[in-house]
Amino acid sequence: MSIILSLETSCDESAAALVSNEKGKIDLLANEIASQIDEHANWGGVVPEIASRRHLENLPFLIEEVFAKSKLQIKDIDAVAATVTPGLAGSLLVGSITARTLANLHQIPFLGIHHLEGHLSSIYLSEKHPKPPFLVLLVSGGHTELIKVDVKHKYQRLGRSHDDAAGEAFDKVARLLGLSYPGGPAIQKIAKSGDPKKFLFPKGRVSKPEGGFYPYDFSFSGLKTAVFRQIEKIRSENKKLPIEDIAASFEYIVAEVLVERSFKCALDQGLNSLVLVGGVAANVRLREMMLAKASENSIDITLAPMEFCTDNAAMIGAAALLRLSSESFKSSMELGVSARWPLEKSDLLYDPIPPF
């Protein structure tokens, strides 16, 4: 049995977890998260300097807590893992330096994990999970991507957003409506009492230079502009702003676009298994529409467990265990952090000569 201490500090969630792998089954032994949402809400978004300071304060206590809850000690750990990319550089450094220090001190391997690989691995924390190949819709505050996972667990990006990620669009539209941060939960809450068909907002497409559109790509900046113009139009007519209807219509069109392009991609690629992960995967309307579409098309669907949709260290531990079980992967102690790094190049995080 392998046991990993995993850390996540890529943005505004400080997290630590202890995860084990026995006979191919991943078990969560302890999982702790310290959220900074309330503090960043005062600023309408994440303030990088505040985020990194809070990670410094929170992480030692979270590590202490997971060991106390699991009744394990550091001598029981086989490796330490931390998110090293992508994310806020200052925040990533806190987790990375902590993990490398512990690994060096106790002479155990260190694994630098790609944050998106962590999200992809969140499905292995559920009782039932698919076997590759499958298509993943990864949708969060910073990313909206369609990723094919092949039988060797190699990644191929087939679709992406060319501007705002879906979660970012939720935050921006929430701000236009005067709602709190983060925008996803705020919009979902008031959308429940709105009419999702009241306003017909556009489905953004990305044009090819030679004509036509990229079939699996996304664009949400035009949708945000359409919502802004609708709000301005209503206000210019001195009418009461139907916030619930606007929120519901916006939420519906985002979910519809994500569902339509995901299933088109899966069917075109001959994949009969689809996976939904990431922070926006917690959206109830999106989950319901994904399940309904999967039933229509006889495609197997796996939704990330609700508690592991947003950033957490358990998914980072799951990703690290998969790396350890597939080959004897470990990262160089010289591996740093990077605000951006393509998922397709995540294998390079385990090279003797680190990429950054």
From Swiss-Prot:
Pfam families reported in the protein's UniProt record: TsaD (PF00814)
Cofactor binding: number and manner: Binds 1 Fe(2+) ion per subunit.
EC class (word): transferase
GO biological process terms held by the UniProt record: tRNA threonylcarbamoyladenosine modification
Compartments (UniProt record): Cytoplasm
Entry GO MF terms: iron ion binding; N(6)-L-threonylcarbamoyladenine synthase activity
Function: Required for the formation of a threonylcarbamoyl group on adenosine at position 37 (t(6)A37) in tRNAs that read codons beginning with adenine. Is involved in the transfer of the threonylcarbamoyl moiety of threonylcarbamoyl-AMP (TC-AMP) to the N6 group of A37, together with TsaE and TsaB. TsaD likely plays a direct catalytic role in this reaction.
Protein name: tRNA N6-adenosine threonylcarbamoyltransferase
Organism the protein comes from: Prochlorococcus marinus (strain NATL2A)
